[in-house]
A protein has these predicted regions:
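Surface-exposed amphipathic alpha-helical tracts and adjacent flexible/coil segments at the periphery
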Residues: 3-4, 15, 19-20, 36-432
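Alpha-helix capping/helix-boundary segments
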Residues: 7-8
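RNase H-like DDE/DDD metal-dependent nuclease/strand-transfer catalytic core used by mobile genetic elements
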Residues: 12
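Gly/Gly-Pro- and Ser/Thr-rich, intrinsically disordered tail segments characteristic of DNA damage-repair
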Residues: 16-32
């Protein structure tokens, strides 16, 4: 369980003492005293407050080296401290952020006025409370050295392509770090490109650096920025009207925009064209084909856009396709077991499975009586092959111990039945 409420935490520990418990980042644990207290109460892991710097994480780890620390590493951050923000509750009819119902009022535009009603809000800073998104993909080594045992990546209520792309990048970053592998500049650029083409409000790691100034804020907009990939060179009118426009808007004729790319785009990518001087005026179009950095492409758009407009990829078709393919794969997390096979002449054939991570979890199944071979005698390698076929069970064989009398004969379909019975018996033992 991931728990923020202390009453619930103590009730879970009382009624289900064997259940693993993690303290949520919403509990706002931000120092060594709080972390040590969580350990004393029996928490298995503490997810630290998102506002901590790497140096502060290191101090906590040094004070409590035996506590698993989870660190928020990628995704949206709040204007207020983790777990202590009541703005949504007060401003949005009781929609509590601590109950998963945050209405995100910090993302809205606000006007700052003085006591005389005069506006003090500078142009381009309408969203005064809107932070960027955290991205620590290039700080994985520093977080690991500071004592982070787990990285927390935002995923709740996110699209499958977002979750797949973000986890994919961090998985590679962690694996490369643990293997002490240096990545090339091209590979680093490709991974950052993959992150930027997921939903983001631009990126920051200000909290990890111990700062909290303008470098962590997204004053201009709170929606998806994507990745800037090019600029508009110009537009020409297309010889057709724009479908869906009202008759008096027919003057807004469809156009073809010429776009110079400095980043590659893929067929099907959703492109956003937006002018810096008219930030609320934008349109979207679809990339018709793959194109490389340096290419000039043409895209149909609902109206002409002036030269100099920025072009962003705000949705990657490649990421959507990769996530879709991953979701179709049969991904089953299996538990490793040690397998013992006993085949003695005149005795029942027996298969014993023992969980590698907990030898107390063990189950045995017996079946047919082993007889002398009438044709070919069974060898140990045959039993390893056929008993090792765990099929759709939640187990996978980690090791084999085969005791086999010479000259034994048996049908492999009967072997499969005993193996299946052993798997079922072990499942029942685990769930008991």
């Amino acid at each position: 369980f991931i728990i923020q409420d202390w009453g619930l935490f103590f009730e879970v520990k009382r009624t289900m003492p064997g259940i693993e418990t993690h303290i949520s980042t919403q509990a706002n644990i931000h120092d060594d005293r709080g972390t040590l207290w969580c350990r004393e109460q029996g928490a298995d892991r503490v997810t630290l407050s998102r506002e901590l710097s790497i140096d502060e994480i290191s101090v906590i780890h040094n004070a409590a080296p035996d506590v698993d620390l989870e660190v928020f590493s990628h995704g949206a951050i709040c204007f207020c401290y983790s777990g202590l923000c009541l703005l949504s509750s007060f401003a949005m009819a009781g929609r509590s952020a601590n109950r998963g119902m945050c209405a995100q009022p910090c993302r809205l535009p606000y006007e700052l006025i003085d006591e005389n009603g005069r506006s003090l809000s500078p142009a381009g800073r309408e969203r005064a409370l809107c932070p960027r998104d955290t991205n620590t993909s290039q700080l994985v080594r520093r977080l690991y050295d500071a004592g982070a045992a787990s990285l927390k990546l935002e995923g709740r209520m996110k699209a499958p392509d977002y979750v797949y792309s973000i986890v994919d990048v961090y998985r590679h970053q962690i694996d490369d770090m643990l293997a002490d592998v240096s990545t090339s500049k091209d590979e680093d650029a490709a991974r950052q490109r993959q992150l930027k083409r997921c939903f983001n409000r631009d990126f920051t790691h200000a909290y990890q650096d111990g700062t909290s100034g303008d470098e962590m804020m997204s004053y201009e907009r709170s929606n998806n920025r994507g990745q800037i990939v090019g600029t508009v060179l110009g537009s020409r009118l297309a010889n057709r009207d724009v479908r869906g426009l009202k008759p008096d808007d027919r003057r807004r004729r469809a156009a073809i925009a010429r776009i110079e790319l400095f980043e590659p785009v893929g067929k099907g990518d959703l492109l956003e064209l937006r002018h810096d001087n008219e930030f609320d005026q934008f349109l979207t179009t679809i990339a018709a084909d793959d194109a490389a950095a340096g290419d000039v492409i043409e895209c149909r758009v609902p109206r002409s856009m002036p030269e100099g407009c920025r072009v962003r990829v705000i949705r990657s078709q490649r990421a959507i396709d990769a996530a879709g393919a991953a979701l179709k794969r049969d991904v089953l997390r299996r538990r490793a077991v040690d397998v013992t096979v006993v085949a003695r002449l005149g005795e029942p054939f027996a298969v014993t499975l023992t969980c590698c991570d907990n030898p107390a979890l063990i189950a045995t199944a017996t079946g047919f009586t082993v007889e002398a071979a009438k044709t070919r005698a069974v060898e140990a390698s045959d039993l390893v092959e056929h008993v090792g076929r765990m099929g759709s069970s939640p187990f996978e064989a980690a090791s084999f111990d085969v005791s086999l009398d010479a000259g034994c004969g048996m049908g492999f379909s009967a072997v499969h039945k005993v193996r299946a019975a052993a798997c079922k018996a072990l499942e029942e033992t685990i769930l008991a």
